[in-house]
Amino acid sequence: MENNNGNNQLPPKGNEQLKSFWSKEMEGNLDFKNHDLPITRIKKIMKYDPDVTMIASEAPILLSKACEMFIMDLTMRSWLHAQESKRVTLQKSNVDAAVAQTVIFDFLLDDDIEVKRESVAAAADPVAMPPIDDGELPPGMVIGTPVCCSLGIHQPQPQMQAWPGAWTSVSGEEEEARGKKGGDDGN
């Protein structure tokens, strides 16, 4: 469970706590009778997949244990960040910091945030387009139309169609009635 980012390492105390937690978990026996997470709920979630026809009796128990271990590990890493900030309450920022600093939790990062960060960085440092002398574009580029595989095969843009009734006009009488009933007048 080493952090490969290098810039924000956990304190040695935290690494020791995590190591002792994982060594105890690896040595411990799987208790088939006591569960912290509801097994029937896990079975329901597993059955949402249309490809699942039968579930072995051990599968929900193992998945429950894996989820418990995942939650405990993330909580411990978040708790270490809360202690670094001299707080005794976990906050979302602690969980975010634990996720950001741990490579194995990269799947929890929000792709939309990453895309926004990339677009902001691109806008801050625009790359100039090289001048085109002959009026020709580089291979694979056609203005306004995507090109498939740089072969010059143009893909038509899908046409947007409005749903019937999606854009309805309001008659003058209805507008007046809305105004008399206390409408917001577009504010």
UniProtKB/Swiss-Prot annotation:
In the UniProt record, the signal sequence range is none
An MF annotation (GO) of this entry: DNA-binding transcription factor activity
* Presence of keyword Membrane: no
List UniProt keywords, sorted A-Z.
Activator, DNA-binding, Nucleus, Transcription, Transcription regulation
One GO CC term of this entry? Answer: nucleus
From the Swiss-Prot or TrEMBL record, state where the protein is found.
Answer: Nucleus
> What's the family?
Belongs to the NFYC/HAP5 subunit family.
Protein name from the UniProt record: Nuclear transcription factor Y subunit C-8
- According to its UniProt entry, this protein's organism is Arabidopsis thaliana
From the UniProt record, report the name of the gene that encodes this protein.
NFYC8
